[in-house]
């Protein structure tokens, strides 16, 4: 039906007869000549119809936007004044010889040349995908998967599919359940990840596995979550955590280089606890230069009293965390009030700020917002501790840990945005390591920080300790610009250690047998040391396309309620 794609033509094709297929993007009837822009997934090119060909011109005059057509014509160079160098095809046009209309189009319910409300976009997704930005996102997503597959093949990884209909095994989120027609009162679960299957592949002797896998989690949604999502799933035998990270660094560096021509610099590494103490989150955006500073040993804010006092053993239940904000004095009162309101959402304790004035020595600079003036000595120490300079502002808060870190971490993000401290053209990859193996939920029960198959450091658990939250996991998350794009760990390959972890998690022997017996049995047969990671393809694509929502990089996404507006799913089943 066609000889070429619209966006691939250039001046080297001048004089050639070609055939194109696509959609009318724009038309202009100038009485003696008629121009249309024809569009396909590769781009747009201008087509010229001359009135000298009366029948052809008359047929072209009936064209409207989004008609699906075929054009036969000759490539010709535009006259100089009509060349459009902002288009890849702007130096040429097609002189039409034949026109075929495959299908007419009604006026579209969305505008492909401007923004549309998201509900309309998702309802008419098949039309929304015609937008150049959406086509670009889909093409980039495709290119990313090709780069990853080529990298994996080069590094001797095997692409192996694992089951979609599987057994329900608790992994953190709720499962999507599929009833079995043949096995009455029994159910399949859609996989939250291929975790156990890829570990079984390691036991089977497959050294290096990967899969671009569809996963399903029935959890609360937000802009960077979907109920079904795609992950780059990877597992290797006989490699430690450091070597796994090196492989992933090479792969991610290759993707960034080939997609956006950016060479990522050294991947930094922080422990989980250092990340919390320095940035208030385990997913810090390192483009933001603001860091949290513990100043408890300098000052302490008494509860409900707006004054600074010397540290006191009786008041050390709270800690004091400060931040020095570069050029913070440029913030107007509305911004500062908004920060106080932000803090008040999480605590009744007051947020304080200190302004640093004048180009005099640091020990002489001070201007504060305290109702009771602090001792100058403490203020000098605070300014010195935070390395504050002229024009900076210091914020600090007294609260219990870890809440104080969480609050100041949120404030840090807002300040970075409001003061334009973030270089949005830079990339800061970061590994977060040494997570706690366990944490407690709202019922004060131990749960896995990642999943129950994560190994502790050194493959040991001292069961005599009373606080299992102190046990460090051999795990690692990859964070880029504040987004977690991957999470992995060394896995447990010892049967008794796996049982110990299950017991700590409250998974008794009966539950172990019902849910994990197949896996525990497999661990008996020469299980190799192994490790792996899962990277979010959707999030990676979101970052590389500079999108702000996962829905912009998935062809047919769900809403925040898990609905597909295009098809109306979920829906009642009507039997024929």
Swiss-Prot record:
GO terms for molecular function: aspartate-tRNA ligase activity; ATP binding; nucleic acid binding. It is found in: Cytoplasm. The keyword Ligase applies. GO terms for cellular component: cytoplasm. It catalyses: tRNA(Asp) + L-aspartate + ATP = L-aspartyl-tRNA(Asp) + AMP + diphosphate. ATP binds at residues 217-219, 226, 484, 536-539. Residues 195-198 are annotated as: Aspartate. Pfam families: tRNA-synt_2, tRNA_anti-codon. Catalyzes the attachment of L-aspartate to tRNA(Asp) in a two-step reaction: L-aspartate is first activated by ATP to form Asp-AMP and then transferred to the acceptor end of tRNA(Asp). Homodimer. NCBIfam families: aspS_bact, PRK00476.1. This is Aspartate--tRNA ligase. It comes from Buchnera aphidicola subsp. Baizongia pistaciae (strain Bp).
């Amino acid at each position: 039906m066609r000889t070429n794609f619209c966006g691939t033509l250039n001046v080297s094709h001048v004089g050639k007869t070609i055939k194109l297929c696509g959609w009318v993007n724009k038309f202009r009837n100038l009485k003696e000549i008629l121009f249309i822009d024809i569009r396909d997934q590769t781009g747009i090119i201008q087509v010229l119809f001359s009135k000298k060909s009366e029948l052809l011109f008359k047929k072209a005059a009936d064209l409207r936007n989004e008609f699906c057509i075929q054009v036969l014509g000759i490539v010709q160079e535009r006259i100089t004044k009509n060349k459009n160098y902002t288009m890849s095809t702007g130096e040429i046009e097609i002189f039409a010889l034949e026109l075929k209309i495959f299908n007419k189009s009604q006026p579209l319910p969305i505008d492909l040349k401007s923004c549309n409300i998201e509900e309309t976009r998702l309802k008419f997704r098949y039309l929304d995908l015609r937008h150049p930005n959406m086509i670009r996102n889909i093409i980039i997503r495709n290119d990313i998967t090709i780069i990853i597959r080529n990298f994996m093949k080069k590094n001797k990884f095997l692409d192996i599919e694992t089951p979609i209909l599987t057994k329900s095994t608790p992994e953190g989120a709720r499962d999507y359940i599929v009833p079995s027609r043949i096995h009455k009162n029994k159910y399949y679960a859609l996989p939250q990840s291929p975790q156990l299957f890829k570990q079984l592949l390691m036991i089977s002797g497959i050294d290096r596995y990967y899969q671009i896998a569809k996963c399903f989690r029935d959890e609360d949604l937000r802009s960077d979550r979907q109920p079904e999502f795609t992950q780059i799933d990877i597992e290797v035998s006989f490699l430690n955590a450091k070597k796994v990270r090196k492989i992933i660094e090479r792969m991610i560096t290759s993707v960034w280089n080939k997609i956006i021509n950016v060479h990522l610099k050294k991947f930094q590494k922080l422990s989980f606890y250092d990340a919390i103490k320095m940035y208030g989150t385990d997913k810090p955006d390192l483009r933001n230069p603001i860091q949290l500073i513990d100043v408890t040993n300098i000052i302490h804010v008494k509860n409900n009293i707006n004054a600074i006092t010397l540290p006191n053993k009786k008041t050390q239940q709270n800690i004091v965390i400060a931040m020095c904000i570069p050029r913070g004095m440029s913030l107007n009162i509305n911004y500062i009030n908004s920060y106080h309101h932000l803090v008040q959402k999480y605590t009744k304790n007051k947020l304080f700020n200190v302004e640093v004035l004048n180009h005099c020595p640091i020990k002489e600079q001070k201007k504060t917002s305290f109702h009771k003036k602090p001792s100058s000595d403490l203020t000098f120490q605070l300014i010195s501790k935070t390395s504050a300079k002229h024009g900076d502002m210091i914020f600090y808060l007294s609260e219990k840990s870890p809440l104080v870190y969480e609050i100041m971490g949120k404030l840090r993000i807002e300040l970075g945005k409001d003061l334009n401290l973030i270089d949005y053209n830079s990339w800061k990859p970061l590994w977060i390591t040494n997570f706690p193996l366990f944490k407690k939920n709202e019922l004060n029960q131990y749960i896995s920080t990642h999943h129950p198959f994560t190994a502790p450091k050194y493959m040991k658990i001292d069961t005599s300790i009373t606080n299992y939250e102190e046990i460090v996991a051999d795990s690692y998350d990859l964070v880029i610009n504040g987004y977690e794009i991957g999470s992995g760990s060394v896995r447990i390959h010892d049967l008794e250690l796996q049982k110990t972890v299950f017991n700590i998690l409250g998974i008794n022997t009966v539950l172990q047998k019902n849910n994990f017996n197949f896996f525990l049995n497999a661990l008996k047969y020469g299980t190799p040391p192994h490790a792996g990671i899962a990277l979010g393809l959707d999030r990676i694509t979101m970052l590389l396309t500079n999108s702000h929502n996962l829905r912009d990089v998935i062809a047919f996404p769900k809403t925040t309620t898990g609905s597909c507006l295009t098809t109306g799913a979920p829906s009642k089943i009507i039997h024929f």
